[in-house]
Design a protein with these regions (language model features):
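Glycan-recognition surfaces
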Residues: 199-207, 272-307
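Acidic/aromatic-lined carbohydrate-recognition and catalytic surfaces
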Residues: 1-200, 257-286
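Short acidic-aromatic active-site loops that bind/stabilize oxyanions
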Residues: 48, 220-231
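Short catalytic-loop micro-motif centered on adjacent basic/acidic residues
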Residues: 70, 249-253
Length: 307
């Protein structure tokens, strides 16, 4: 016997192939949290079982064998082409489609590529010409630009293409450090305003929302207007899988970049249904294990990738 008693799976939700990286795309580019990836359908069952029924049976079989089932949830990012855009274009960041090829991570002279964006560096970040160029690329969402036109196109099948055609807009890709932009995913707008810790460095707050090192790290930098409807949506991902399939745990992707109040919503809502529900933190530093435990996690990924 191998002694395995937990099955942990990479994301199983439906994901998008738009602007994919590589040939296969990434399951972390989730386009619909609540739908299972249709590619997971077992061809052997044909029409005798639905995909949902297959996963439900899988979880049941694991439980019969005294094995727990854990999934991966992705509440910090979403695919650049996703099912939430139609009703919530304001939950995302936008740039001009015609300037897409110019979009890149801003660099700041004197600050290393992998430096933690602590507050003492942020004034220098905002004074950088490259940062100024970067944040000026961002635009207001299409609905706010022209609500009448938005209502005409929002139900179109190829919505992303329609937005490009009618508004010259695309969702801005996510990025991290000096890596090339993550072309297939973007960040959620966790707050409806700018971070209170750094907005003093802006020339004006009368500008579109933007992605920058501080807005990415919403665990460190907070607005005063939480995007409550979005938070409630994200906090219901795990309960949805509990209700439908009876899963036993989840790893929270980029949980380290979530507002602490949202993280607590996610953890507490899951444990209202199952007090023994387990969470894995995407924490690579063993020295932060106690912090993860205090936040409600049961375990961390650890430093196995770098050993």
């Amino acid at each position: 016997k191998m002694g395995i008693n937990v099955v942990y799976m990479l994301p199983i939700s439906k994901f998008s192939l738009k602007d994919k990286k590589g040939d296969l795309g990434s399951p972390y580019g989730v386009s619909n949290f609540n739908e299972l990836d249709p590619n997971l359908k077992d061809y052997l069952t044909k029409d005798s079982m639905t995909l949902d029924e297959e996963f439900e049976a899988f979880v049941e079989a694991c439980h019969i064998l005294n094995m727990r089932v854990m999934i991966d949830i992705i509440p910090r990012t979403n695919a650049v082409e996703n099912d939430l855009i139609k009703d919530h274009p304001d939950w995302f960041y936008w740039i001009k489609a015609s300037e897409y090829e110019k979009y890149k991570v801003p660099t700041v002279e004197g600050i290393g590529n992998t430096t933690l964006p602590i507050l003492e560096y942020m004034e220098k970040v905002y004074k950088s010409e490259d940062t100024f160029r970067h944040i000026n690329m961002f635009q207001y969402n299409p609905k706010d630009q022209n609500k009448v036109l938005w209502n005409k196109i929002k139900n179109k099948k190829n919505l992303s293409e329609e937005i490009e055609k009618k508004f010259d807009l695309r969702i801005a890709p996510a990025f991290s450090d000096s890596q090339p932009p993550w072309t297939d995913v973007t960040f959620f707008r966790m707050y409806e305003d700018f971070p209170k810790e750094t907005k003093e460095f802006l020339d004006t707050t009368d500008r579109p929302p933007y992605i920058l090192f501080d807005t990415i790290k919403s665990n460190m930098y907070h607005g005063e207007k939480p995007n409550i409807k979005l938070w409630e949506k994200l906090a219901d991902i795990v309960p949805s899988y509990q209700r439908r399939f009876g899963i036993d745990g989840a790893r929270i992707d980029m949980g380290h970049a979530l507002p602490s109040k949202l993280l607590q919503m996610i953890i507490s809502k899951a444990r209202e249904n199952d007090e023994d529900f387990s969470f894995i933190a995407e924490e690579l530093q063993v020295s932060n294990a106690q912090f993860a435990y205090d936040a409600g996690y049961n375990m961390i990924i650890g430093n196995g990738f770098t050993m």
